[in-house]
């Protein structure tokens, strides 16, 4: 009997960047400039971000989306989370934002490097995993007045919510999240010194 060849499927849509509106005001005057509240972002204290908690918040929100669309929840996978964290850290430390590293390695390479095997058959196709990435920020906006920066900081909850909202508004990322055959995911977060929050999501 002839053997049917199975197709292989790797899924990685383009990365998503949440942009920060920047404003700058520079004044030259003899007297100190009064601080007008309507010129400045809403004053919030700088958030304390617990990366592990943020990852779990994103994971819970992802499962909320799946449940709302009649899908089963997916389990947290520590091995996938380690792979995701490594990619988020690599993007932050080497100043790039892409599924492929500067050496041209995509998530399938990262799975193999860590000894992670993903193979989910559906019909004639074997799905080998998927990846979403997003670049978020610690703050919504920054206004500089006479050289002094005023930040509208984001809370940890808001970072999680805007991350999932951003993915769900992007067709490719949304499709990855809502694919019915995934059973596991890992979320990896790394915060760069400049306030950029790199987030990687890996599926199997």
Predicted segments, located by residue:
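N-terminal Sec-pathway targeting helices
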Residues: 4-17
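Bacterial N-terminal signal peptides
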Residues: 15-25
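N-terminal Sec signal peptide cleavage junction
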Residues: 29-30
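Short, low-complexity, disordered segments immediately C-terminal to signal peptides
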Residues: 33-45
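Short, contiguous strand/loop micro-motifs
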Residues: 48-50, 150
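Short, well-ordered surface patches within globular domains
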Residues: 50-117, 174, 180-194
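A well-ordered secondary-structure block
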Residues: 107-193, 197
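Low-complexity, Gly/Ser/Thr/Pro-rich intrinsically disordered linker/tail segments
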Residues: 197-204
């Amino acid at each position: 009997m002839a053997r049917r060849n199975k197709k292989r499927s790797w899924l990685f849509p383009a990365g998503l960047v949440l942009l920060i509106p920047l404003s700058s005001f520079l004044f030259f005057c003899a007297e100190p400039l009064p601080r007008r509240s309507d010129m400045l972002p809403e004053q919030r204290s700088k958030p304390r971000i617990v990366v592990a908690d943020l990852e779990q918040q994103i994971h819970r929100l992802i499962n909320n989306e799946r449940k709302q669309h009649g899908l089963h929840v997916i389990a947290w996978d520590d091995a996938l989370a380690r792979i995701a964290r490594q990619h988020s850290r690599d993007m932050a430390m080497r100043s790039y934002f892409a599924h492929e590293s500067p050496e041209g390695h995509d998530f399938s390479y990262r799975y193999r490097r860590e000894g992670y095997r993903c193979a989910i058959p559906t019909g004639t196709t074997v799905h080998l995993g998927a990846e979403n990435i997003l670049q978020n920020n610690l703050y919504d906006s920054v206004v500089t007045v006479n050289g002094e920066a005023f930040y509208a900081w984001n809370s940890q909850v808001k970072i999680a919510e805007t991350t999932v909202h951003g993915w769900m508004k992007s067709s490719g990322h949304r499709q990855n999240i809502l694919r019915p055959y995934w059973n596991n995911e890992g979320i990896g977060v790394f915060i760069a010194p400049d306030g950029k929050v790199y987030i990687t999501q890996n599926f199997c």
